[in-house]
Protein backbone atom coordinates (compact mmCIF):
# COMPACT_ATOMS: atom_id res chain seq x y z
CA UNK A 1 0.00 0.00 0.00
CA UNK A 2 1.36 3.42 -0.97
CA UNK A 3 2.20 5.91 1.73
CA UNK A 4 2.15 9.69 1.56
CA UNK A 5 4.95 11.95 2.78
CA UNK A 6 4.61 15.67 3.42
CA UNK A 7 7.57 17.98 2.75
CA UNK A 8 8.49 21.33 4.26
CA UNK A 9 10.63 23.56 2.05
CA UNK A 10 13.26 25.32 4.14
CA UNK A 11 13.29 29.09 3.74
CA UNK A 12 16.56 30.73 4.73
CA UNK A 13 16.55 33.57 2.24
CA UNK A 14 14.15 35.88 0.47
CA UNK A 15 13.07 34.75 -2.98
CA UNK A 16 13.78 37.15 -5.82
CA UNK A 17 10.86 39.15 -7.21
CA UNK A 18 10.93 41.68 -10.09
CA UNK A 19 9.92 44.40 -7.63
CA UNK A 20 13.39 44.15 -6.09
CA UNK A 21 14.84 45.68 -9.26
CA UNK A 22 13.11 48.96 -8.43
CA UNK A 23 15.60 49.74 -5.69
CA UNK A 24 16.50 48.70 -2.19
CA UNK A 25 18.89 46.15 -0.81
CA UNK A 26 18.05 42.48 -1.03
CA UNK A 27 18.00 40.83 2.40
CA UNK A 28 20.78 38.44 3.36
CA UNK A 29 19.93 34.78 4.06
CA UNK A 30 19.05 33.85 7.63
CA UNK A 31 20.99 30.67 8.23
CA UNK A 32 20.24 30.91 11.94
CA UNK A 33 16.57 30.08 11.34
CA UNK A 34 17.14 26.69 9.75
CA UNK A 35 17.27 24.66 12.95
CA UNK A 36 14.10 26.35 14.17
CA UNK A 37 12.39 25.47 10.89
CA UNK A 38 13.37 21.81 11.24
CA UNK A 39 12.09 21.80 14.80
CA UNK A 40 8.80 23.35 13.71
CA UNK A 41 8.45 20.93 10.79
CA UNK A 42 9.00 18.02 13.17
CA UNK A 43 6.41 19.32 15.64
CA UNK A 44 3.86 19.83 12.85
CA UNK A 45 4.27 16.28 11.58
CA UNK A 46 6.22 16.84 8.37
CA UNK A 47 8.17 13.89 7.02
CA UNK A 48 10.91 15.75 5.17
CA UNK A 49 12.67 19.10 5.22
CA UNK A 50 13.76 20.15 1.73
CA UNK A 51 16.47 22.57 0.60
CA UNK A 52 16.29 23.86 -2.97
CA UNK A 53 19.15 25.18 -5.11
CA UNK A 54 18.41 28.67 -6.40
CA UNK A 55 20.40 31.50 -4.77
CA UNK A 56 22.23 29.40 -2.18
CA UNK A 57 23.85 25.99 -1.83
CA UNK A 58 21.33 23.40 -0.55
CA UNK A 59 24.03 21.18 0.92
CA UNK A 60 25.16 23.98 3.24
CA UNK A 61 21.57 24.47 4.36
CA UNK A 62 21.18 20.78 5.15
CA UNK A 63 24.49 20.75 7.03
CA UNK A 64 23.01 23.38 9.34
CA UNK A 65 19.62 21.66 9.48
CA UNK A 66 21.26 18.36 10.41
CA UNK A 67 22.44 19.88 13.69
CA UNK A 68 18.84 19.91 14.94
CA UNK A 69 17.94 16.53 16.51
CA UNK A 70 14.96 15.25 14.54
CA UNK A 71 13.72 12.02 12.95
CA UNK A 72 12.58 13.65 9.70
CA UNK A 73 14.38 13.26 6.39
CA UNK A 74 16.61 15.97 4.96
CA UNK A 75 16.44 16.29 1.20
CA UNK A 76 17.85 18.36 -1.62
CA UNK A 77 14.97 19.20 -3.87
CA UNK A 78 16.81 19.56 -6.10
CA UNK A 79 20.58 20.00 -6.26
CA UNK A 80 22.12 20.56 -9.69
CA UNK A 81 24.09 17.55 -10.88
CA UNK A 82 25.87 18.60 -14.06
CA UNK A 83 27.50 21.64 -12.48
CA UNK A 84 29.86 19.44 -10.49
CA UNK A 85 31.62 16.08 -10.59
CA UNK A 86 29.63 13.06 -9.40
CA UNK A 87 32.54 12.28 -7.08
CA UNK A 88 32.23 15.71 -5.44
CA UNK A 89 28.51 15.12 -4.95
CA UNK A 90 29.20 11.63 -3.60
CA UNK A 91 31.52 13.08 -0.95
CA UNK A 92 29.11 15.75 0.29
CA UNK A 93 26.18 13.33 0.27
CA UNK A 94 28.16 10.73 2.25
CA UNK A 95 29.11 13.32 4.85
CA UNK A 96 25.57 14.72 5.15
CA UNK A 97 24.12 11.23 5.43
CA UNK A 98 26.59 10.47 8.21
CA UNK A 99 26.08 13.81 9.94
CA UNK A 100 22.30 13.40 9.95
CA UNK A 101 22.28 9.82 11.18
CA UNK A 102 21.23 8.38 7.83
CA UNK A 103 18.44 10.84 7.02
CA UNK A 104 19.64 12.29 3.71
CA UNK A 105 17.56 11.91 0.55
CA UNK A 106 19.63 13.11 -2.40
CA UNK A 107 17.50 14.88 -5.00
CA UNK A 108 19.32 15.76 -8.22
CA UNK A 109 18.39 17.46 -11.46
CA UNK A 110 20.04 18.21 -14.78
CA UNK A 111 18.80 21.82 -15.19
CA UNK A 112 18.48 23.09 -18.76
CA UNK A 113 21.35 23.59 -21.17
CA UNK A 114 21.46 27.38 -20.90
CA UNK A 115 22.00 27.38 -17.14
CA UNK A 116 24.62 24.63 -17.23
CA UNK A 117 26.67 26.17 -20.05
CA UNK A 118 26.09 29.91 -19.57
CA UNK A 119 25.57 30.33 -15.81
CA UNK A 120 28.06 27.68 -14.68
CA UNK A 121 30.31 27.38 -17.73
CA UNK A 122 30.09 23.60 -17.71
CA UNK A 123 29.74 21.28 -20.73
CA UNK A 124 26.40 19.88 -21.86
CA UNK A 125 25.79 16.42 -23.25
CA UNK A 126 22.96 13.90 -23.57
CA UNK A 127 21.19 14.60 -20.26
CA UNK A 128 19.43 11.29 -19.68
CA UNK A 129 22.45 9.07 -20.35
CA UNK A 130 24.68 11.47 -18.46
CA UNK A 131 22.36 11.38 -15.44
CA UNK A 132 22.35 7.58 -15.51
CA UNK A 133 26.15 7.60 -15.58
CA UNK A 134 26.24 10.28 -12.85
CA UNK A 135 24.15 8.20 -10.45
CA UNK A 136 26.18 5.11 -11.28
CA UNK A 137 29.42 6.95 -10.58
CA UNK A 138 28.19 8.13 -7.18
CA UNK A 139 27.04 4.65 -6.22
CA UNK A 140 30.40 3.24 -7.30
CA UNK A 141 32.13 5.66 -4.92
CA UNK A 142 29.81 4.78 -2.07
CA UNK A 143 30.32 1.06 -2.67
CA UNK A 144 34.09 1.49 -2.69
CA UNK A 145 34.06 3.47 0.54
CA UNK A 146 31.76 1.04 2.32
CA UNK A 147 33.35 -2.20 1.10
CA UNK A 148 36.98 -1.16 0.77
CA UNK A 149 37.04 -2.52 -2.77
CA UNK A 150 38.91 -0.61 -5.50
CA UNK A 151 36.97 2.07 -7.34
CA UNK A 152 36.33 0.92 -10.89
CA UNK A 153 33.56 2.63 -12.86
CA UNK A 154 33.48 3.09 -16.61
CA UNK A 155 30.72 4.73 -18.60
CA UNK A 156 30.18 7.02 -21.55
CA UNK A 157 30.59 10.16 -19.43
CA UNK A 158 32.64 9.15 -16.38
CA UNK A 159 35.60 6.83 -15.84
CA UNK A 160 36.77 6.42 -12.24
CA UNK A 161 39.70 4.23 -11.21
CA UNK A 162 41.53 6.01 -8.38
CA UNK A 163 40.49 5.97 -4.72
CA UNK A 164 43.45 5.52 -2.38
CA UNK A 165 42.82 5.00 1.36
CA UNK A 166 43.88 8.56 2.08
CA UNK A 167 40.88 9.86 0.14
CA UNK A 168 38.28 7.24 1.07
CA UNK A 169 35.90 8.06 3.94
CA UNK A 170 35.33 5.27 6.48
CA UNK A 171 32.31 2.95 6.27
CA UNK A 172 29.08 4.17 7.85
CA UNK A 173 26.19 2.52 9.70
CA UNK A 174 23.55 3.30 7.05
CA UNK A 175 25.32 3.20 3.69
CA UNK A 176 22.28 3.35 1.41
CA UNK A 177 21.60 6.93 0.32
CA UNK A 178 18.26 7.26 -1.50
CA UNK A 179 18.61 9.09 -4.82
CA UNK A 180 15.74 10.85 -6.57
CA UNK A 181 16.09 12.72 -9.85
CA UNK A 182 13.94 15.39 -11.44
CA UNK A 183 12.39 14.14 -14.67
CA UNK A 184 9.98 15.47 -17.29
CA UNK A 185 10.64 13.75 -20.62
CA UNK A 186 10.30 10.04 -21.34
CA UNK A 187 13.99 9.12 -21.33
CA UNK A 188 14.78 10.83 -18.02
CA UNK A 189 11.71 9.22 -16.46
CA UNK A 190 13.02 5.83 -17.57
CA UNK A 191 16.41 6.60 -16.02
CA UNK A 192 14.68 7.47 -12.76
CA UNK A 193 12.85 4.17 -12.78
CA UNK A 194 15.96 2.20 -13.69
CA UNK A 195 18.69 3.53 -11.40
CA UNK A 196 17.02 5.66 -8.72
CA UNK A 197 14.92 5.26 -5.59
CA UNK A 198 12.35 7.77 -6.79
CA UNK A 199 11.52 10.72 -9.00
CA UNK A 200 10.75 14.39 -8.48
CA UNK A 201 8.12 15.49 -10.95
CA UNK A 202 7.76 19.04 -12.20
CA UNK A 203 4.97 21.16 -10.80
CA UNK A 204 3.45 21.69 -14.24
CA UNK A 205 1.88 18.26 -14.69
CA UNK A 206 -1.62 17.07 -15.52
CA UNK A 207 -3.49 13.86 -14.83
CA UNK A 208 -3.14 12.95 -18.51
CA UNK A 209 0.62 13.49 -18.35
CA UNK A 210 0.89 11.25 -15.31
CA UNK A 211 -1.18 8.46 -16.88
CA UNK A 212 0.25 8.60 -20.41
CA UNK A 213 3.85 9.75 -19.90
CA UNK A 214 5.14 9.64 -16.33
CA UNK A 215 3.86 6.37 -14.90
CA UNK A 216 4.43 4.19 -18.02
CA UNK A 217 8.01 5.39 -18.47
CA UNK A 218 8.85 5.08 -14.79
CA UNK A 219 7.55 1.51 -14.90
CA UNK A 220 9.50 0.79 -18.08
CA UNK A 221 12.71 1.93 -16.44
CA UNK A 222 11.94 0.03 -13.25
CA UNK A 223 11.49 -3.18 -15.22
CA UNK A 224 14.92 -2.68 -16.82
CA UNK A 225 16.51 -2.36 -13.37
CA UNK A 226 15.96 -6.02 -12.59
CA UNK A 227 14.44 -5.22 -9.21
CA UNK A 228 11.49 -7.37 -8.09
CA UNK A 229 8.15 -5.85 -9.06
CA UNK A 230 7.15 -6.04 -5.40
CA UNK A 231 9.68 -3.26 -4.71
CA UNK A 232 7.79 -0.86 -6.98
CA UNK A 233 5.66 0.09 -3.98
CA UNK A 234 8.80 1.58 -2.38
CA UNK A 235 9.60 3.76 -5.40
CA UNK A 236 9.01 7.36 -4.35
CA UNK A 237 7.07 9.72 -6.62
CA UNK A 238 7.37 13.26 -5.32
CA UNK A 239 5.77 16.51 -6.41
CA UNK A 240 3.51 17.40 -9.27
CA UNK A 241 0.91 20.16 -9.40
CA UNK A 242 0.62 23.72 -8.13
CA UNK A 243 -1.50 24.82 -5.18
CA UNK A 244 -2.72 28.32 -4.33
CA UNK A 245 -3.57 29.03 -0.70
CA UNK A 246 -4.96 32.37 0.51
CA UNK A 247 -6.89 33.80 3.49
CA UNK A 248 -9.78 35.17 1.38
CA UNK A 249 -11.25 35.13 -2.14
CA UNK A 250 -9.58 38.36 -3.25
CA UNK A 251 -6.16 37.13 -2.17
CA UNK A 252 -6.85 33.79 -3.82
CA UNK A 253 -7.73 35.51 -7.10
CA UNK A 254 -4.43 37.39 -7.01
CA UNK A 255 -2.56 34.19 -6.23
CA UNK A 256 -4.21 32.42 -9.17
CA UNK A 257 -3.27 35.25 -11.54
CA UNK A 258 0.33 35.07 -10.35
CA UNK A 259 0.31 31.31 -10.79
CA UNK A 260 -0.86 31.71 -14.38
CA UNK A 261 2.34 33.59 -15.17
CA UNK A 262 4.39 30.85 -13.50
CA UNK A 263 2.69 28.18 -15.59
CA UNK A 264 3.19 30.27 -18.74
CA UNK A 265 6.89 30.64 -17.94
CA UNK A 266 7.47 26.93 -17.45
CA UNK A 267 5.31 26.09 -20.45
CA UNK A 268 7.51 28.26 -22.66
CA UNK A 269 10.87 26.77 -21.63
Residue ranges and their predicted role:
Residues 1-74, 177:
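N-terminal beta1-alpha1-beta2 module of alpha/beta enzyme domains
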Residues 2-7, 20-22, 90-93, 97-198, ...:
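Internal, glycine-rich beta/alpha segment that forms the wall or movable "lid"
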Residues 12-17, 52, 75-77, 107-109, ...:
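A cross-family glycoside hydrolase active-site/sugar-binding cleft signature
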Residues 47, 197-200:
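Receiver (REC) domain switch/active-site residues of two-component response regulators
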Residues 49-60, 81-87, 206-210, 244-246:
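Acidic-and-aromatic substrate-binding clefts and catalytic sites of carbohydrate-active enzymes
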Residues 61-79, 83, 134, 223-224:
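Alpha-helix-loop-beta-strand connector modules within alpha/beta enzyme cores
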Residues 238-251:
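Short, conserved secondary-structure transition motifs
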Residues 252-269:
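Active-site pocket-lining/capping segments in soluble small-molecule metabolic enzymes
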Amino acid sequence: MATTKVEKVLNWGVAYTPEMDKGGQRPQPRWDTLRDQVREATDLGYDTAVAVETQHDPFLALAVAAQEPSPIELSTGIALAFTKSPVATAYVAWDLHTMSGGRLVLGLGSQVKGHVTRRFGMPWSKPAQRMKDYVGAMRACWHSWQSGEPLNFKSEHYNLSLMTPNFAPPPIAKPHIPVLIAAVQERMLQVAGEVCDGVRLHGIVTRRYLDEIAFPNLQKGFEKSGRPQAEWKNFEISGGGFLCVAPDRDALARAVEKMKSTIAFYGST
